[in-house]
Amino acid sequence: MNKITNNVTIWIKPKTVEKKWYVIDAADRVLGKVAVDVVRILRGKHKAYYTPHQDLGDNVIVINASKVRLTGKKYQQKLYYRHSRYPGGLYSDTFRTLSERKPCAPLEIAIKGMLPKGPLGRGLFRNLKVFSGSEHTLKAQNPVKLEANLER
């Protein structure tokens, strides 16, 4: 406690925070801009008591992930790499082939790359649910549709 101002730092515990559910529609929006807004909510940066080393963020449902948009020639040229962990087992997919095989994967990969690495990031990624269509199975959570700050 500071003797001059009598300020005390308040530490919020993750168990005491009530997590809300938000729905974000990714249709006809740029992949990176949607991912930035999703990560901001997952990390809790929109809250006044944001702490970087704790999971104080909210849960996010992303719908229409298969209709996300890319700029330039990235639809044909952007590459995603994976490895089978065997010698010579490096595989690459373009955005087009990956989105045909797994429609939600490009958005999930973009979001996962923006989250912190380690146990905190894995826990935050579990708060994300991505659906390729316009319907989701989490209506019981009463999610709030989020429209703000998605188009810059």
UniProtKB/Swiss-Prot annotation:
NCBIfam families: rplM_bact (TIGR01066)
Record's keyword terms, sorted: Ribonucleoprotein, Ribosomal protein
The protein's name in its UniProt record: Large ribosomal subunit protein uL13
CDD domains documented for this protein: Ribosomal_L13
SUPFAM superfamilies for the chain: Ribosomal protein L13
Pfam families reported for this sequence: Ribosomal_L13
Gene Ontology cellular component terms for the protein in this record: cytosolic large ribosomal subunit
UniProt subunit comment: Part of the 50S ribosomal subunit.
Gene3D superfamilies from the UniProt entry: Ribosomal protein L13 (3.90.1180.10)
Domain of life of the organism encoding this protein: Bacteria
Statement: the UniProt record of this protein carries the keyword Phosphoprotein: no
Family that this chain belongs to: Belongs to the universal ribosomal protein uL13 family.
Gene designation: rplM
Family matches, as PROSITE patterns: RIBOSOMAL_L13
Its job: This protein is one of the early assembly proteins of the 50S ribosomal subunit, although it is not seen to bind rRNA by itself. It is important during the early stages of 50S assembly.
